[in-house]
Amino acid sequence: MYNDGLISLKFKNKTCFKSEYVGFDAIKPINVIIGKNNSGKSQLLNSIEAYLNDKLGDTKYKESFCIKKEIIGKRQESVNQIYDEMSKYSQYLSINRPNFDKMLGTYTFDGEKISRIVDSKSIPLTEYVKDRYNYIATNVLEVRKYWTTNKIFRRINAERDIIPEHDIPSEINVQNITSNGAGITTILSQVYNLKRYKDDDRTIRSDILKAFNKILGKDTSFIRIDVKRITDDNTSLQSKWQIYLEEEQKGLVELDNSGSGLKTILFVIINLLLIPKILNKPLSSFVFAFEELENNLHPALFRRLLSFISQKIIEEKSTLFLTTHSNIALDFFSTEKEAQIVTITHDGNSAMTKTVMSFSDKANIINDLGAKASDLLQANGIVWVEGPSDRIYK
């Protein structure tokens, strides 16, 4: 998304973003949205999803939005048409074609009309030419065509789970994987058990296992991931498919009994590795929105998960929007040049966003989140070992 010409994106609606346009002054590969619970983080992701799916005008959303996007090299036929029209007014606008293309580089769209399309301080334009230019651009460019970016949007909700599921359809459909985790077991059962996928996808199964163990680090190591049919306790006629993790000492362990932290890790891996493989699309074709991945993850494990995600997103030129209220995510991405941190706050009436630029901004975020030194140990106190006697500080 960041490499598809989108420069900035902001939204305004009647529900959450009432007083001002809320969003991003710039789009980076990794965009961390940090704020308290119920501050509007999920609503902002809803707006991004609606933008990418060209649904901002639907009754459900009814949002106006400001968008600034490069259009050079996109729909060149329309650009040529505008230039041909504008050449009639060349006496007012003495520029050649390359300069014209440069001038046409960005536009801002607000609601249902272009509020500014000429973005050039170096080229003087009369008001007549500006008005005529905007009129032509509105009608010839058909700006709605530029709302969408042909990106595939994938989301992981804060409320999520991976559970046993019935049946294995003969065809894989990634649309059946919902943002709360439904469909994960089914798609893995297809990849691991249907012959045509089982024979073709040995590499991806190996990649999934390697990524899983890389994120887990020294905490534990699995030698195999498998999906097997289980029989319901109530009746032998009902059966489900269950994901299993195999450890060398413990044998097969049901994912359903392994804790939600491992489920989150697997969910992320499925989105970043398996779904692009199934769709035969590069990761750069995707925009990901992950919500509160820190839930039920140990801090060190969460850092390794963030490291895995950031490496994939940056190296393969994808885009991530990550919501969090974790100071760990703030620390992790605060020095990453390919990431930005945007705070979202709510005054009781409307949400507001601000891009974090300074150290004091980061300190204010930590205070706003209510983070304490003892959170390092997820405890109410820290034991400092200074000698023969210990003391608990609170």
Where is each model-derived feature located?
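Coupling/switch segment of ABC-type P-loop NTPase heads
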Residues: 68-219
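Switch/communication elements of ASCE P-loop NTPase nucleotide-binding domains
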Residues: 1-58, 236-375, 382, 391
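Extended helical coiled-coil dimerization/tether regions that scaffold
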Residues: 2-5, 154, 158-287
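Ser/Thr- (and often Asn-) enriched beta-sheet segments in non-cytosolic proteins
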Residues: 8-10, 23, 64-68, 106-108, ...
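Short beta-strand-centered segment that lines the nucleotide-binding/catalytic pocket of NTP-utilizing
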Residues: 57-65
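A short, compositionally biased domain-edge/stem linker segment
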Residues: 1, 134-143, 224-226, 230, ...
